[in-house]
């Protein structure tokens, strides 16, 4: 479960075109009129993304480590910004798997780092890591996931105290994202006052 907040700091950016007018009969000066056009920004938002897990077994990976996003890649890339919720961790080995009260319904996801390329190839610009699986392998899993996303140039938000929001520029437009969830280690969706501060800080920048 997660919630997304996005700001387009420059969504009202104007592009100007100059149109020349003929001088009036009684004037010898030219006047220039500016015609302003609004720039339309398109954003594609994707829900839970889990490309496969090598934990507890490689049998949970797709056949031949195939890219399950391939068939929708062109659609995902057909936007100014593509956002998704990374449901799990992104690293190869290690970490401490979480324990569950009921092991029969315990889901723990560790997607191999090489699968991160599928996210980049599909045009993902920013990911929410605020969800119930970002802590599946504890602090090590979170840190390794961040490092792998950094190496791919994919931004992220949603971790309490460290990466609560993110601001970045693309094609001359400045974007701000925040992500919230009701889970440990994430920016709490239930702490309204803190959420207001996160939003306030985004708007101030």
Regions found by a protein language model. Name each.
Residues 1-6:
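Sec-dependent N-terminal signal peptides
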Residues 8-10:
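C-terminal motif of bacterial Sec signal peptides marking the signal peptidase cleavage site
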Residues 12-205:
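Acidic, metal/ion-coordinating pockets
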């Amino acid at each position: 479960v997660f919630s997304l907040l996005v700001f387009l700091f420059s969504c009202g950016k104007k592009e100007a075109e100059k149109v020349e007018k003929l001088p009036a009969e009684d004037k010898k000066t030219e006047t220039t009129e500016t015609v302003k056009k609004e720039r339309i920004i398109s954003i594609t938002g994707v829900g839970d993304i889990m490309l496969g897990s090598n934990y507890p077994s490689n049998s949970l990976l797709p056949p031949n480590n195939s890219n399950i996003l391939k068939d929708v890649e062109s659609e995902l890339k057909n936007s100014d910004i593509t956002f998704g919720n990374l449901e799990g961790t992104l690293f190869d080995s290690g970490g401490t798997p979480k324990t569950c009260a009921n092991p029969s319904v315990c889901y723990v996801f560790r997607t191999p780092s090489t699968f991160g390329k599928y996210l980049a190839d599909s045009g993902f610009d920013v990911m929410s890591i605020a969800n119930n699986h970002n802590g599946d392998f504890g602090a090590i899993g979170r840190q390794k996931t961040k490092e792998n996303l950094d190496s791919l140039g994919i931004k992220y938000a949603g971790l309490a105290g460290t990466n609560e929001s993110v601001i970045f520029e693309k094609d001359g437009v400045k974007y701000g994202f925040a992500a919230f969830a009701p889970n440990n280690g994430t920016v709490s969706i239930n702490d309204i006052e803190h959420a207001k501060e996160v939003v306030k800080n985004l708007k101030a920048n």
